Regions:
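Alpha-helical solenoid scaffolds in eukaryotic proteins
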Residues: 55, 95, 150-158, 188-189
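Alpha-solenoid HEAT/Armadillo-like helical repeat scaffolds in large eukaryotic proteins
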Residues: 64, 80, 99-100, 155-160, ...
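Long, acidic/serine-threonine-rich intrinsically disordered regions with weak helical/coil propensity
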Residues: 2-135
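Long alpha-helical HEAT/HEAT-like repeat alpha-solenoid scaffolds in very large eukaryotic proteins
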Residues: 1-5, 10, 155-156, 186-191
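Flexible loop/turn segments at the boundaries of HEAT repeats in alpha-solenoid HEAT proteins
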Residues: 89, 141-146, 177-187
Length: 191
C-alpha cells in the first residue's frame, strides 16, 4: 500500500494518519504509527521517483506521528544515495549535512558513521558497508554509470570525516577504486 497509494492516487501513505482522530491517538495507535512510518520510509526504495512527494515526506519526518529512529532514516538515505534523480539521494544528504556547523554535524553524525559502516549482529552489511564494498569491487569504475558514481563518491566523501580510522581508510580506498577510470566524475565531485 505504501507504494500503490502514492503511485496510483498521488497521496502519501502518511496521509492515512490524518484519518486517526486526535483524541484516539493515545489509545494504542502507536503500533499502527510504527507500521505506517516504516512502510512509508521503506517504500522510498521501490517507488517511481515521480510519485515521491519530498515536501510531504520531510513534513512527516518532523511530525509527532513519525516513529522513525534517526539512524534508521540515515541508513535509508545511504540506501537511496546512488539513485540518480531520487529526491533523497546523496545530493540531499550533502545538503542536509551542510546545514549544520561542523561541531553539530560531528556530534550528530559521528556515532552514525562509526556504527553503521560495518555489519549488524547477524553479520549482514549495513548500507554504508555495502556502499564501501561496492565501490571497492573489481572493475566498478569501468562498469558504473557516471551519475551513480558521482552520487556514491559524494556519500563516501562524508565518511572521510569519520573519527574511526578504519572507516576513513576504507572509504579512501573505495573512492580511489571507484573514481580511477572516471576522472571527469572525480573533478565534478571535488567541486
Amino acid at each position: 500500500m505504501a507504494i500503490l497509494i502514492p503511485e496510483r492516487f498521488a497521496h502519501e501513505m502518511t496521509d492515512v494518519i490524518r484519518l486517526i482522530p486526535e483524541d484516539e491517538y493515545e489509545r494504542g495507535y502507536c503500533t499502527c504509527l510504527d507500521t505506517i512510518s516504516e512502510a512509508e520510509i521503506n517504500s522510498l526504495c521501490w517507488r517511481a521517483i515521480e510519485s515521491i512527494d519530498k515536501k510531504t515526506i520531510r513534513q512527516f519526518l518532523g511530525s509527532k506521528y513519525c516513529n522513525i529512529d534517526p539512524d534508521y532514516w540515515y541508513n535509508k538515505l545511504v540506501e537511496l544515495s546512488t539513485i540518480p534523480n531520487h529526491p533523497f539521494n546523496a545530493d540531499y544528504f550533502h545538503a542536509l549535512m551542510m546545514r549544520f556547523t561542523m561541531p553539530k554535524r560531528d556530534g550528530r553524525f559521528q556515532f552514525f558513521f562509526n556504527g553503521c559502516a560495518g555489519y549488524d549482529d547477524n553479520r549482514c552489511a549495513n548500507p554504508l558497508r555495502r556502499l564501501i564494498d561496492w565501490a571497492w569491487s573489481e572493475n566498478v569504475s569501468v562498469k558504473a554509470d557516471p551519475e551513480s558514481t558521482r552520487l556514491a563518491a559524494v556519500m563516501l566523501c562524508w565518511l572521510l570525516s569519520s573519527t574511526y580510522i578504519k572507516h576513513r581508510d576504507e572509504a579512501t580506498k573505495a573512492l580511489v577504486n571507484l573514481l580511477s577510470e572516471q576522472v571527469e566524475v572525480l573533478i565534478e565531485t571535488l567541486r
